[in-house]
Amino acid sequence: MTAEVFDPRALRDAFGAFATGVTVVTASDAAGKPIGFTANSFTSVSLDPPLLLVCLAKSSRNYESMTSAGRFAINVLSETQKDVSNTFARPVEDRFAAVDWRLGRDGCPIFSDVAAWFECSMQDIIEAGDHVIIIGRVTAFENSGLNGLGYARGGYFTPRLAGKAVSAAVEGEIRLGAVLEQQGAVFLAGNETLSLPNCTVEGGDPARTLAAYLEQLTGLNVTIGFLYSVYEDKSDGRQNIVYHALASDGAPRQGRFLRPAELAAAKFSSSATADIINRFVLESSIGNFGIYFGDETGGTVHPIANKDAHS
């Protein structure tokens, strides 16, 4: 899309292709009442001095309180805290009633069981269109070692879910595959008969194994997103774990990217591949993804929790 005036929803969906973590930004207002909102626009800025930033919509109900606060905290949610993320993304009257929290050294709300937290003094507030960029100087932090909660394309993903999928498939040979997307087009290997890129698990982290394989295959930078399909192919006894992944711009070394209109006429190597591609095209068109569990002929699609990870 190259028009001077973009469709806001389409632009937001494109921004959502970038996989991020999820945070809840907290502070205390002038009356000492805790305030907070969910945000995935969190970035580390500098080690010396220790700086980070987060973006806040000017339309947020927390805008006045947050921008006038002298201090704030970033709570990096762990993979078990989807409910916390959803609570602080919605206009709930008492968001803090549903979470275990305490005041930090500088008076900011700190959540229990987060992957990490940072308490900050307000360094700067920068105007940026319909948002402001809040830059904080880290005054205290803690890293729990827990896995963080991931977010991409309107859905959550977690390392634990991937681990469970691999554990469930330990009795057979495990094939890792990917629906590798580049600006709406899907990468496929082969010439006349097309297949999803795939490799065999050799131990360790399946997402890292798959990312390394895809980058070697395509010569592009690859970000592994959410789990997309877990199924057994009874014809060969193999367990298949398929992720959604994103590729950087550029032409691949091997294979090709096909857009949805081209996929409709494509010939696939198996009915399972065709089913995955057809489901992805449909789910992409409505922006609502799920995870398939079953075999190559039938199973169940479990919806990925949807939310707006914004203030």
From Swiss-Prot:
Keyword DNA damage: no
Enzyme Commission numbers on file: 1.5.1.-
Entry-linked InterPro entries: Flavin_Rdtase-like_dom, NADH-dep_flavin_reductase, Split_barrel_FMN-bd
SUPFAM superfamilies xref list: FMN-binding split barrel (SSF50475)
Keywords, ordered alphabetically: Flavoprotein, FMN, Nucleotide-binding, Oxidoreductase, Plasmid
SMART domains from the UniProt entry: Flavin_Reduct
Coiled coil ranges: none
Cross-referenced Pfam families: Flavin_Reduct
Residue positions binding FMN: T38, A39, N40, S41, C55, L56, A57, K58, S59, S60, R61, F88, A89, R95
GO MF term (any one): riboflavin reductase (NADPH) activity
Family statement: Belongs to the non-flavoprotein flavin reductase family.
PANTHER family from the UniProt entry: FLAVIN REDUCTASE, FLAVIN-DEPENDENT MONOOXYGENASE, REDUCTASE SUBUNIT HSAB
Protein name stated in the entry: Probable flavin reductase
